[in-house]
Amino acid sequence: MYQPDFPPVPLRLGLYPVVDSVAWIECLLAAGVRTIQLRIKDKRDAEVEADVVAAITLGRRYDARLFVNDYWRLAIKHQAYGVHLGQEDLKTTDLNAIRTAGLRLGVSTHDDMEIDIALAARPSYIALGHVFPTQTKQMPSAPQGLEQLARHIERLADYPTVAIGGISLKRAPAVLATGVGSIAVVSAITQAADWRAATAQLLAIAGVGDE
């Protein structure tokens, strides 16, 4: 059995929106979301520090699991709940500093080789994607689909996992049926005609996660 070498997270993190602004963080936490990620890309630390601080403050106010994507130094400095890193970030990040600071770590993966790399770091959770085609970001790999996702879940057994990539309200039940512990969503909420209704429906399907 694989054991994380970072502080643990619940096996089921529930609905896990990934958003690029503090405004979305505040709206979704107020709507009942309890696991969320701030993902701001391609800016210097100084440019995003105020947003990171505001997001972490909101996370504490709502007793939520607030992950910061990429900006691990700021996450440590301001004591976020956790950090999420991509495969390339793993090579340049001081993982021991994150661990010593008591922050949780999530790592993105796209195939078996990247899962091996993630497992070597023994993070708090492993993200598996992209499950379906996605317009949110350019992806060099092909979508994995539900069968491949289910195979990864079987391999990872009781390790906390998150599925990401093209997960819509309609697709969410089938994704969760693979046994994955959480679904990360972006456009299913941010591009919904009624984001409040979409969030409520997704929460009803995926839950808020375990305590």
From Swiss-Prot:
Protein name listed in UniProt: Thiamine-phosphate synthase
The reaction(s) this protein catalyses: 2-[(2R,5Z)-2-carboxy-4-methylthiazol-5(2H)-ylidene]ethyl phosphate + 4-amino-2-methyl-5-(diphosphooxymethyl)pyrimidine + 2 H(+) = thiamine phosphate + CO2 + diphosphate; 2-(2-carboxy-4-methylthiazol-5-yl)ethyl phosphate + 4-amino-2-methyl-5-(diphosphooxymethyl)pyrimidine + 2 H(+) = thiamine phosphate + CO2 + diphosphate; 4-methyl-5-(2-phosphooxyethyl)-thiazole + 4-amino-2-methyl-5-(diphosphooxymethyl)pyrimidine + H(+) = thiamine phosphate + diphosphate
This protein's pathway: Cofactor biosynthesis; thiamine diphosphate biosynthesis; thiamine phosphate from 4-amino-2-methyl-5-diphosphomethylpyrimidine and 4-methyl-5-(2-phosphoethyl)-thiazole: step 1/1
Details of cofactor binding: Binds 1 Mg(2+) ion per subunit.
Protein residues bound to Mg(2+): D70, D89
Species in which this protein is naturally found: Salmonella arizonae (strain ATCC BAA-731 / CDC346-86 / RSK2980)
Swiss-Prot/TrEMBL keywords: Magnesium, Metal-binding, Thiamine biosynthesis, Transferase
SUPFAM superfamilies the record matches: Thiamin phosphate synthase
Pfam families the record matches: TMP-TENI
Keyword DNA-binding annotated: no
Binding site for 2-[(2R,5Z)-2-carboxy-4-methylthiazol-5(2H)-ylidene]ethyl phosphate: T134, Q135, T136, G166, V186, S187
Enzyme kind, highest EC tier: transferase
Gene that specifies this protein: thiE
Disulfide bonds: none
HAMAP family: TMP_synthase (MF_00097)
Function, in words: Condenses 4-methyl-5-(beta-hydroxyethyl)thiazole monophosphate (THZ-P) and 2-methyl-4-amino-5-hydroxymethyl pyrimidine pyrophosphate (HMP-PP) to form thiamine monophosphate (TMP).
GO cellular component: cytoplasm
Named cofactor requirement(s): Mg(2+)
EC number: 2.5.1.3
InterPro entries noted in UniProt: Aldolase_TIM, ThiamineP_synth_sf, ThiamineP_synth_TenI, TMP_synthase
Family that this chain belongs to: Belongs to the thiamine-phosphate synthase family.
